[in-house]
Amino acid sequence: MAENTELRRELWILGIKPGEGREDLLSSYLESGGYVCRLGQCENLESGRPLGIVLDISPFSEDGWGILLKIKSSPKTCNIPVLPVFLSVNGKIGGVFPVAGFFTLPVDEEYLQDRLAVYGLTEEAETWDLQSMVVSRSGEEKLSKAIERLGFDVIKGYTGKEALALASIHPVYMIFCAQMLPDMSAFELQERLRLDPYSSNTPLFVLLKDSMKDGERLALSRDVAHLVRKKQLSCEEFLGYLRRKE
């Protein structure tokens, strides 16, 4: 057992202030699934290099959105997988948001190509005519051109409702979506896409602005709170999300 533990890097829990104990239930769920985990700090990520991060982005977190932006803005930590979760003030797990990944704007084209190759999402573009969707108020022309150079056709949506309508007509291979759209967040768009059997497994990548004001981070946390459907997920429900993320 000790040997296996050494071979597997840890999952870190971030966004929780040490001493609060809000991570206790989450830790017990992870440990019951066979994962090694601990409460970590953002400043230790470069040296610690965890296998992945479970990040609290609720209104009760310790600047969860700020931590996410720091992780994804640094070349030394941006490729560490992050699973955002909603933890109540008492640490109950109310929601999990297993998006495929995050990119900060403006997206570096070489990094985009590398990450999509790691996810195995570029190979079939050489053989098949595949469509990707970019959902953003601005249209993200530079990103769209980079995706086209990887061999994908690009269709654009400017609101969440438009993206849902387009996805029902044109099945897409993957989606890039701004974190906040005029009518919904990227997480809400993903929740709605999962209700449609034709788009339930479509990878969705979230596009983060390169900086966020305090008010923006608070608004994002409150928006996530509206997506919470249960007071507490069971251990099996939570681990199911985590396994799909792997």
Spans of model-derived segments:
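Helix-enriched interaction subdomains in cytosolic or periplasmic regions
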Residues: C78-L112
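Eukaryotic modular interaction domains in large regulatory/scaffold proteins
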Residues: I147, D153-A163, F176
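Conserved phosphotransfer microenvironments
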Residues: E23, Q41-N90, C177-L195, S200-N201, ...
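Alpha-helical segments within the soluble intracellular
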Residues: E31, I147-E148
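As written
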Residues: G94-F103, A186, E216-R229
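Short beta-strand/turn micro-motifs composed of small residues
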Residues: G15-K17, L55, F86, V134-R137, ...
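Conserved acidic residues
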Residues: P50-G52, A100, V172-M174, A225
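Non-catalytic signal-transmission and effector/linker regions of two-component phosphorelay proteins
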Residues: M1-L51, P75, D108-E141, K161, ...
